[in-house]
Amino acid sequence: MLDSKLLRTELDETAEKLARRGFKLDVETLRNLEEQRKSLQVKTEELQAQRNSRSKSIGQAKAKGDHEEADRIMADVANLGSELDEAKAALAELQQQIEDIALSVPNIPDDSVPLGKDENENVEVLRWGTPLAYDFEVKDHVDLGEMADGLDFASAVKISGSRFIVMKGQFARLHRALSQFMLDLHTEEHGYTEMYVPYLVNPDSLFGTGQLPKFGEDLFHTSPLTEQVSDVPLKKLSLIPTAEVPVTNMVRDTITDEADMPLKMTAHTPCFRSEAGSYGRDTRGLIRMHQFDKVELVQITRPEDSMAALEELTGHAEKVLQLLELPYRKVVLCTGDMGFGSRKTYDLEVWVPAQETYREISSCSNMWDFQARRMQARFRRKGEKKPELVHTLNGSGLAVGRTMVAILENFQQADGKIAIPQVLRKYMNGVEFIG
């Protein structure tokens, strides 16, 4: 969430910056609530001071033996206490209203982010590799996978429903090989620490990274199937939409030493998304699934280092595509296409031959102090007593299923077989072709 000071002392300027991303901040409501809050804050402090002053008089009256006066003062103190409780309750309600509004406000775009309404106004900054020209009819990954009996959508529908997949044999092995290759690259060459994390998380974790309260419908939530058998309250958990959630929450409510920064963590996990707003989109194939695997990259940095870290992290995701020899382009998202908590985002889009277009395969974002403020994730500089908020960054390095799509389609042969990229062959026991 944004610094509350921005909504108090720089309200108009903040509204202008948010308008760049198409968000209309309710300035008048916030201004009125803030005026009421200030008034109630003053009233509360005055009542507190009056009650404290009158309370001291009780002992003085008793010391003089004037018990009648002491009783009158005690009655006054009780009345002041009731007024104070009412004022505190009203103040808490006002503060909650202000916080509810603040939680619905997205991050402020960085000045370097291009102005735009939607994905059509994103700006391409780099293109790597050249799409192949095929002398045969290109098949999509669904046809290629079903021809080889490696992708079984029918069984997945029977087991779970639409937007799920069963992979078999060498296709399942290729999926595993991709995950292993990505993890090895990021841990051995890029300096990340591998993490194994829970796939079920509590509401506090989802609040910390910004999925709650605004995006609850995009998640899969669990409900206990059995009756409560102890005094421990049953907690509602949710399946992770991305490893960003558990990995970033590692620093929630902690203070990190400056000497230990940056923290660089990676995790391979399944991800679960309801795709509530994607009805009718990408209904064929592996592009948009309820369950998919992803290797996530997370960095925790000092504020002054985060923009350079975004370039580095994005470069780490790009390296995966380059080693796999997959043509891609890099775009910076415009203000109207940015994620809720992002300050600046790069998307990497891989070439998909059957669609004759580039499709997103990684999104790398600098969240600034937006998540850190929610999580109270801080660090302490050497020689300083007061801790500061960290900056958090995350990105896909990469989405495994979409990387499968790209390999199947870009490396297809005229006979329907798939050539295995050179860097993956050691993970495939030397196999050069599948299908």
From Swiss-Prot:
Its EC number is 6.1.1.11. Pathway: Aminoacyl-tRNA biosynthesis; selenocysteinyl-tRNA(Sec) biosynthesis; L-seryl-tRNA(Sec) from L-serine and tRNA(Sec): step 1/1. It is found in: Cytoplasm. GO terms for biological process: selenocysteine biosynthetic process; seryl-tRNA aminoacylation. It comes from the Bacteria. The keyword Zinc does not apply. Residues 49-58 have a biased composition (Polar residues). Gene3D superfamilies: Bira Bifunctional Protein, Domain 2, Serine-tRNA synthetase, tRNA binding domain. Keywords: Aminoacyl-tRNA synthetase, ATP-binding, Cytoplasm, Ligase, Nucleotide-binding, Protein biosynthesis. Homodimer. The tRNA molecule binds across the dimer. Catalyzes the attachment of serine to tRNA(Ser). Is also able to aminoacylate tRNA(Sec) with serine, to form the misacylated tRNA L-seryl-tRNA(Sec), which will be further converted into selenocysteinyl-tRNA(Sec). This is Serine--tRNA ligase. It comes from Aliivibrio fischeri (strain MJ11) (Vibrio fischeri). The gene is serS.
